[in-house]
Amino acid sequence: MHRKILLLLLATAFTSAWSQDILRSSTGEWEAKISEKGVIQSLKMTFGNDKSVSVPWHSTGEYAGPSFSYTDLYKKKAFTYSSMKTYPLSHSIKYTEENGKLTLLLTVKNNSETTQVIEDETSFRLGINTIMANPKEYFSIFFPTLLRSEKTHFWGYFEAPDGHVLALASSDPIASWHLDYIGNGHRIASACLDLLHPLPLPQRHPQDLFSLAPNETKNWKLVFIPLSNINEVPSAVAKAISIPMIHLERTTASPGETTDIHILSTGGIAPKLIISGPQGQQVPARLVKKTGNDYHYEMVASEQDGMYNIIAQTDRYHTEANIYVRKPWSWYLAQAGKEALRMEQKTARHREAWMGFFSAYWSQVYLPNPAQLNETEEKFEKFWEVMIDPQTGFYDTDKETWHTRPQNTSWMVGVLVARYAATKKIEHLELAAQWADFLIDKFQLPNGAYKGYTALTMGAKFIQELMWFEVPLTKKSAVWKARYKKHQESVAAAAQNILFVKDMGDTEGESTYEDSQAGTAWSLLAMHALTNPKGKDAAQFLKESIAIQKRHECLTQALIPDSRMRGGTLRWWEAQYDVLIMRNMMNSPHAWTMRSQFGAMYLYLLTGKEYYLNVAFNVMASCSQAIDHHTGELRWAFVPDPHVKVKQFVQNYRKSGEGKYVDEVIGEQWVPMISSWWRVPEQEVPWNNERGWSCDNDVHEHFRFMAEQFIPNAFVIERPDGSLRTWNCTIKRQGEKLVITPAEKLVTRVHFNLQKRCQVEIAFADKKEYASLEKGMHWIGRGLSDYRIPSIYLWNEMITKK
């Protein structure tokens, strides 16, 4: 009996060993175990100088890979796996090592005598397990941060919060890609490369990979590249598949500003650089220097605003990028204010339905228009009448307006502060203070959390903005002094809670490592570090903010050379709530992009690192494109996915006020708002399946931060090599003096980050200012006399002002 069991075990072990191939790198940097069906059972890789790491993988089940859709593969010989030839199309995978990298050779063949037109797609599932479900595993899961098809090749990368990066590259064109969204929830299972795909596809994609001729075979080479951080991606991809890569540190500029363009190429000959303006005109760029395989160009933004397309071209390869030359920031804020009135700000249970009041009020602070302000006030009063219980002054619980969601309360504090800033009526600030007290009394727990949603409520940010206007009043009123003290203590308690919870706080809906929770956490920690520079935890606030920002990078389009998406955080479940499209797709940028990234400006002011300033301006420019550049119309969010079949909710022109669903394909485009026509019946507060309900007004989150951080400010950096870069202004040297011209008249402050002492002259709209500045960082301008917006980054100047 024992002998039979032993023989059975030996036979099982032999079968298992025979059926599994093990491919090891000659350099010892990776090891792949592969099943008899060609599916990776385990993959270990070394990322930089770290020890070997197991890449999470789907080795069985629906998302197992690598695999072809609807096709089983079988082992043909060692490391080679093929499908049966009885199908019209046959498929195969061969695993190999090339130049030290794990390389897959993929083949699709038409075995028939007729052309095979691809009606859906020929998908190659990677099998990387991207499901962020277990908080204990969040930091080791590789998220599909960037996938990008180009006309002649493909590249992208998966990044884990712990910083490990797995880049992918193919020297062959791949038609498209898609992600394995799990239902309508908050998780993604894996990613697929669509080797062949029907049109339409974005113009940057190959436009001819939708069929196979009789007996035609197509081949693709796919290279896996483990890296220690995303900064290595452009050069590593360029080297791995010998293509030109375009790297942009900033993807936006105002007229007259200089943008750096880096072309990384291993060919030994500089790729041809072609820059086309909005009307197709050729735009010059100057080659500054060549360092190894890095060709560094400078482009000065012309006076014509719009999209500038960049092409780096060799004999075989064609790589694209773009830069957005923007209009003045004030134009976008003004349009957002107008659009907030054209769209309905809705009586609804979710703050996302009425956030347009932010744009309506903040635009009036900088660009006053009495008629527009009166219209805003009338609409707000009608909204308030329906939503608020006149007996308590807060929620109308009979209508179940919003009493269980702390974020509705915190955002209302913000709206009331904006209303006060626009109207200067003290009763509006009184109301904001009462609502802040309500947030604290009803929702703040003994541990400082706002009902567990400390980051998501952004309660500390909104109360800090309220305190900005309370500070002067504390010097004259004991009542305001007591209010300020209560609010200050609440913010301090919330700060300690975030310092403890970090980026692992609660989220709404299905739990995951979420862009909004993690992003708001690091942004709030940066705010606390900036407003408490001498506090006992200031250094810890800053340290944790920087660490979380780095982890959050995996959920951010931090590297994409596309100004429409740069800096957008990656979120994919909002369309069903915001614009009633019942299909998951990436929304990036989405409204919550700015709430996730507003701390970048604070980190720049704390560290002086140009990287953070570029993050801030790149993401603001991406989000500002929610305003159509030509028409001024507000759109909801950008969808990076190249091809998504949806039932889109559109206006039914045959039935007034009603909508209908139509078949559409969405791909790399802005999705329109629906609140201009999808309206709530008067005096009603709809549920989410009733007429008029939608959450697309969350898009106005972008313009809150534009008003605070971007409208009044310009920035100048002197780099260690002596070169100068500007944001929201232009600069000229006149001998030893720097002459600064702000981009628009609403700029009232210029921030300098200098390597040495210098004289400066600033041509503000109302007067010129002169200063002699030492090495380091300095603000020059009106400062707190420009008191219109809560400028949290000037907090310490505020509280010490006499």
Task: Give a label for each model feature.
Residues 327-605, 609-626, 630:
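Catalytic cores of extracellular degradative/oxidative enzymes
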Residues 132-134, 235-258, 319-353:
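Low-complexity, Pro/Ser/Thr- and charge-rich linker/hinge segments at domain boundaries
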Residues 4-14:
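Sec-dependent N-terminal signal peptides
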Residues 21-22, 230-259, 267-269, 305, ...:
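Terminal, non-catalytic domain-edge segments
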Residues 267-331:
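Extended acidic/polar, glycine-enriched regions
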